[in-house]
From Swiss-Prot:
Keyword field: Coiled coil, Host membrane, Membrane, Signal, Transmembrane, Transmembrane helix
Residue runs in coiled coils: 208-256
Organism classification: Viruses, Duplodnaviria, Heunggongvirae, Peploviricota, Herviviricetes
Membrane topology: Single-pass type I membrane protein
Annotated GO CC locations: host cell membrane; membrane
Positions in the Cytoplasmic compartment: 688-693
Organism the protein comes from: Ostreid herpesvirus 1 (isolate France) (OsHV-1)
Segment forming the signal sequence: 1-17
Extracellular side stretches: 18-666
Name of the protein this chain belongs to: Putative transmembrane protein ORF68
Keyword NAD applies: no
UniProt keyword Chloroplast present: no
Main location as per UniProt: host cell
């Protein structure tokens, strides 16, 4: 996890001006009732350049250090017994450790499918299917290098497909054929090193050996120290022979004792260095195991393939693409990106003692890394103190946008969930991108194009009470709906982290945006509670006084019904007002044949704002009461249906008179409306009785 954070930080720190990492975390279109909140980054690369790395599995070869001879008095004077005790101590520690490390490597490698042996189906008449073993060898490699080879029964990497189908989705048969060829060619290459790239017949596939220099150096160091200890033993024997008979007995023993002490120190130094090498090897093997665990999760591991190796392949690919010309390019030149993608195919060969990792480097002309935004819808009230509100219906769950802002694509939650990866997601089913010149409703909202929004979006008009709630739109900012506005209800602002701060109150507001300061909380009794905020605490809490001032979005769908574009040019989808916006707007009631249905919270009760305004325009009246509607029913005998319109902008023409609708006019309408139904009922009874006569 820590390594992933480091790689992501490296990727972010090296991003260019037009990079997915510099795109905003949130895009506010609250005046339309939508908030775009940043989701995961996805990769959209249609073509893939495949490269296979061969990684050698560590081989821990340890030969126990042999004892020096200690069968004469002269050798004993040279401290041979003390030296042998040191050798026994080292061997006693190292041999069990090497055995344990070998067991751990085998355990780590066990889940990885082995390409050396597998079973292929073979039909034997009525006896049913029998199975035979196929092994990696010249015959198979000759077959697989045939350009007409299509795999037939599955190829020796069918086990890879079976393994990944349960873990992260099957690799394509094209992937398997390419890595088959890579393994066969690597088996024939003797002197290949990590700097040498071998290209297959295909233009977009290469392979190389990624040597584990660290492990190779440790193995060489262990062999070297073992050799030096053996040389010391021989030196002791030679020394004892040379000094014998050359001096008197006493002088001989003193000379040998001094030489033996010196040699003992030399042996101790080499053995301690040997023990340090063993400890380093143990840590290196642990890194290899961590790399295998990362690989099993579907990602490339830097413990197995170094950043320099990936960078070298990136340079090769970039050079090829430059030579070809055109607009095709790699998704990203930064090696850190490819350690974050879940797109590797891997297998092992026990015969070759190697691990094979095929990495796909996505290539694109448009798209590449794209930022996704989750579309969060909210109600925007017609007025603060009324239940009528608007909301945009039928929006996608996510909108993916390219860093240059020229292309987009829409995703559902299930489609995003099916993509693999943590920081950067790779989707199995990639799609073509749409240009922002051909917009959908979601794209128009992202671009804040009011003309296209009014044309393409299904804006719904609802007469339901929005329950009290606080919706978090950024770290410390909330969109608030209150059902108790206008009742004198108040909220409490408490700041327990600020010394000597006395709790204050604020009036309840509806469809407002509130930023809660660091160290404070907002308590709305009986409605909601915004807990203590710890975001943005860069200031010294004792040196400032928090202030919470609500801001108010405006209902742009309604405003466009009463004003032309020239009046609204300065009001964008993200502009919030510091005051409550006021406009005398008439009540717009959805008309149904059965009035009892109009109180049900159903799809019928949620009406299209376009249709309602069209009906209002066609009839040139606003129904102020149920009695007025009954009068029309009695005198017209036609069903009242909301007619369709082409665009909302057509509906908004010639409606400026609605702004003059006042309280007096509404009362007059109600008074006349109470008289006319009575006359209509009397008239209906008269007609009915006359027909019976």
């Amino acid at each position: 996890m820590i390594l992933t954070i480091i790689l992501y930080t490296l990727l972010f720190s090296t991003c260019s001006a037009q990079s997915v990492h510099t795109m905003p975390e949130a895009v506010s279109r609250l005046n339309w009732g939508v908030m775009f909140n940043r989701g995961p980054t996805i990769m959209n690369g249609i073509t893939k350049y495949r490269h296979t790395f061969e990684v050698k599995v560590p081989q821990l070869v340890y030969t126990p250090i042999v004892h020096m001879k200690c069968d004469t008095d002269y050798l004993k004077v040279l401290h041979c017994e003390a030296i042998n005790d040191l050798i026994d101590s080292i061997n006693g520690q190292v041999e069990p450790l090497i055995t344990e490390l070998k067991t751990r490597i085998a355990t780590w490698m066990n889940p990885i499918p082995n390409v050396d042996t597998l079973t292929l189906p073979e039909t034997q008449g009525r006896r049913g299917r029998r199975r035979r073993e196929a092994t990696l060898g010249p015959d198979y490699c000759k077959k697989i290098n045939d350009p007409n080879y299509e795999g037939g029964g599955g190829g020796f990497l069918s086990s890879v497909g079976n393994f990944f189908s349960s873990l992260m989705g099957s690799p394509t048969w094209d992937d398997i054929k390419i890595i088959d060829k890579h393994i066969c060619q690597l088996a024939d290459v003797v002197d290949l090193n990590k700097e040498k790239i071998v290209q297959l017949g295909t233009e977009f596939a290469t392979f190389s050996k990624a040597a584990n220099n660290r492990m190779d150096a440790l193995e060489d160091g262990m062999k070297n120290i073992n050799t030096r200890v053996t040389e010391t033993n021989l030196l002791l024997e030679k020394l004892s022979t040379e000094v014998t008979g050359a001096l008197t007995q006493l002088e001989n023993e003193i000379k040998m004792s001094m030489a033996g002490t010196n040699l003992l120190f030399r042996v101790q130094k080499q053995l301690y260095k040997f023990q340090e090498q063993i400890n380093t090897m143990s840590a290196t093997v642990e890194d290899f195991g961590n790399g295998i665990n990362v690989l099993l999760s579907g990602r490339l591991a830097p413990q197995l393939v170094s950043v320099d190796s990936v960078k070298y392949v990136i340079d090769i690919i970039s050079e090829k693409l430059t030579q070809q010309g055109g607009e095709t390019r790699l998704v990203d030149q930064n090696p850190a990106l490819y350690y974050l993608l879940n797109n590797v195919v891997f297998t092992k060969s026990e015969k070759l003692n190697s691990l094979y990792i095929m990495v796909s480097f996505p290539i694109y002309s448009i798209g590449g890394l794209m930022a996704t935004y989750r579309l969060d819808k909210t109600y925007i009230s017609i007025k603060e103190d009324v239940v009528s509100s608007t909301q945009i219906a039928d929006l996608p769950d996510f909108l993916a946008v390219t860093p240059d802002g020229l292309y987009y694509s829409e995703f559902s939650t299930s489609e995003i969930s099916s993509c693999t990866g943590d920081v950067i997601k790779s989707c199995k089913n990639e799609r073509a991108l749409q240009s922002f010149t051909q917009m959908t409703c979601a794209a128009a909202l992202y671009k804040d194009d009011s003309t296209k929004i009014l044309e393409l979006c299904d804006i719904r008009y609802d007469q339901i009470t929005v329950p009290s709630t606080a919706i978090k739109i950024t770290d410390d900012t909330y969109m608030i709906h209150s059902s108790k506005v206008g009742t004198g209800h108040q909220w409490t602002i408490s700041c327990p982290l600020i010394p000597n701060y006395v709790s204050t109150t604020m009036d309840a507001c509806n469809a407002c945006v509130v930023q809660v300061s660091c160290g404070c909380e907002l308590i709305a009794p009986g409605e909601f509670y915004i807990p203590l905020q710890l975001t943005g605490c860069s200031k010294v809490l004792s040196s400032y006084i928090p202030h919470i001032e609500p801001k108010f979005p405006v209902n742009l769908p309604v405003l466009y019904a009463y004003f032309d574009d020239s009046v609204l040019n300065e009001i964008n989808g993200d502009k919030l007002l510091n005051y409550k916006w006021k406009l005398d707007i008439p009540s717009i009631a959805p008309l149904e044949e059965e009035w009892s249905q109009s109180v049900e919270r159903s799809q019928k009760y949620s009406s299209s704002l376009k249709k309602l305004l069209e009906e209002t325009k066609a009839n040139r009246k606003v129904y102020a009461s149920k009695a007025t509607a009954m009068l029309k029913k009695a005198t017209d005998f036609t069903d009242l249906k909301l007619s369709k319109i082409k665009t909302l902008s057509d509906t908004f023409k010639d409606l400026s008179w609605l702004t003059k609708f006042g309280t007096g006019g509404g009362i007059a309408g109600v008074t006349i409306g109470l008289l006319l139904p009575i006359l209509a009922i009397v008239f209906s009874c008269y007609v009915f009785c006359k027909r019976r006569v």
